[in-house]
């Protein structure tokens, strides 16, 4: 519980400017040079049928692009739900919590960071793709927004976060806007 308070204190939109200082102290995860590591973040852990379909589409896209030489890590708000989804969809992936510094360690250690599915809208959880992309760009990683919706955006804090996410993105593939 003490760690949860520490993570909650630092993993939020308002801490974007300080996050690189924290990320510097977090160990990189060793990589397998023969595999591309794809770190997928989004609103996983709250999966709808649409979220599951988009996740399967993202996984199939990168398996095809890299001839199955890929390793998937999925960042989840509720990992136990996402583990069940991976089982149901026969997706071989590690699942990590986006409520811990695993978010940062995977963002700096993966080859490609994908914000996949779900909307970019007024949600406090926008810190997930925002912080992941900010760290990824600092470590020269590729970032992709894949299959997301856009809006509604009513508050400046969230509108600015979405603008930052999109500006950090190397590729943007929206489903609607």
Stretches found by the model and what they are:
Residues 1-155, 164:
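Aromatic- and Gly/Pro-rich donor/ligand-binding loops
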Residues 157-171:
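Membrane-proximal helix-turn-helix segments that form the acceptor-binding/catalytic region
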Residues 172-177:
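A short, active-site helix/loop in glycosyltransferases that binds the activated sugar's phosphate group
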């Amino acid at each position: 519980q003490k760690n949860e308070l520490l993570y909650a204190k630092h993993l939020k939109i308002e801490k974007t400017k300080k996050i690189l200082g924290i990320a510097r102290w977090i160990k990189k995860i060793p990589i397998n040079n023969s595999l591309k590591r794809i770190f997928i973040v989004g609103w996983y852990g709250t999966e709808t049928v649409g979220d599951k379909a988009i996740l399967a589409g993202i996984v199939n896209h990168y398996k095809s692009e890299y001839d199955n030489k890929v390793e998937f890590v999925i960042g989840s708000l509720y990992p136990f739900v996402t583990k069940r989804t991976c089982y149901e969809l026969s997706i071989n992936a590690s699942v990590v919590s986006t409520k811990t510094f695993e978010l940062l360690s995977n963002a700096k250690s993966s080859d490609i960071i994908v914000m996949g599915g779900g909307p970019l809208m007024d949600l406090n959880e926008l810190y997930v793709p925002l912080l992941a992309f900010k760290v990824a760009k600092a470590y020269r990683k590729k970032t992709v927004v894949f299959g997301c919706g856009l809006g509604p955006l009513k508050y400046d804090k969230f509108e600015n976060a979405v603008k930052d996410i999109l500006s950090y993105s190397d590729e943007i593939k929206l489903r609607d806007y």
